[in-house]
């Protein structure tokens, strides 16, 4: 006997929604998925009418669905946004060169202007050359740092008001786990924020897909027949994030709600006033936002150019060492006070 769509539209169900377990037809799934993203955007006031927004486009499922849905919602709900695509070419043969063809297809399909910036033109290096220098153990550190700054550089060139990234619920839950496991309180503070950055010296980043499950994004792209690039980065298997992802998938098997549980827990975390926040400023070399002097991108680039590629890896800045020392001293004083009060 066929299962009928739970939305009571009368149609036969075509899928079981991962997030809720509801049996839905394709059209009702599309409507629910799009409505949730619209609610996320409107309830969080992610955009203002008249703003220019850059969609960080990689050609993958997340950025492709993000571009498609933002264009659709912008027209349906009259957001009044000017949407553009911003893509970063890291210089990874057999991966990024192919995915950029998909980005160009997105440009044509959604009629959005596209800007492509490469590591080679920004830094004088490609990831292929960097990996040849350092091996595969720390390549994601270089790529992540350079990519974040490259997006800022591209956004500044385009004169946009914000950058919309395709981070989904799974990504954010993984990041919470990674930061807990690493004891990185600075990143743990902001990793669940739907908006980061902003202010006079930086362009804010927003995450419209923050509460969207990865499985649902794949289903949406599949049933909508969207064109996206599905090959994993050739350097990704060695990434630390992969271990957090595998752990999360194991947890999800025994507790299907674990993704949202972790996100909500991250949102509710409170930090002691004694835990210092890193102060954000402007790098004295490149002029872009940084919490250290010089910024991490400049330190890594200097190491590459000097033939010392591991110069900036695994080392803390003087400021970070001072903050760590202050936190350690405060913890020791608190412990001493507790012992004193026990007597």
From Swiss-Prot:
InterPro entries according to UniProt: CTU1-like_ATP-bd (IPR056369), CTU1_C (IPR032442), Ncs6/Tuc1/Ctu1 (IPR000541), Rossmann-like_a/b/a_fold (IPR014729), TilS/TtcA_N (IPR011063), tRNA_thiolation_TtcA_Ctu1 (IPR035107), TtuA-like_LIM_N (IPR054306), UPF0021_CS (IPR020554)
Highest taxon listed in the record's lineage: Eukaryota
GO cellular component annotations of the record: cytosol; cytosolic tRNA wobble base thiouridylase complex; mitochondrion
EC annotation from Swiss-Prot or TrEMBL: 2.7.7.-
Major location category of this protein: cytoplasm
Pfam family, one: TtuA_LIM_N
Transmembrane segments: none
Localization: Cytoplasm
One Gene Ontology term from the biological process aspect of the record: tRNA thio-modification
Database matches in PANTHER family: ATPASES OF THE PP SUPERFAMILY-RELATED, CYTOPLASMIC TRNA 2-THIOLATION PROTEIN 1
UniProt family annotation: Belongs to the TtcA family. CTU1/NCS6/ATPBD3 subfamily.
Its job: Plays a central role in 2-thiolation of mcm(5)S(2)U at tRNA wobble positions of tRNA(Lys), tRNA(Glu) and tRNA(Gln). Directly binds tRNAs and probably acts by catalyzing adenylation of tRNAs, an intermediate required for 2-thiolation. It is unclear whether it acts as a sulfurtransferase that transfers sulfur from thiocarboxylated URM1 onto the uridine of tRNAs at wobble position.
Protein name, UniProt field: Cytoplasmic tRNA 2-thiolation protein 1
Phylogenetic classification of the source organism: Eukaryota, Metazoa, Ecdysozoa, Arthropoda, Hexapoda
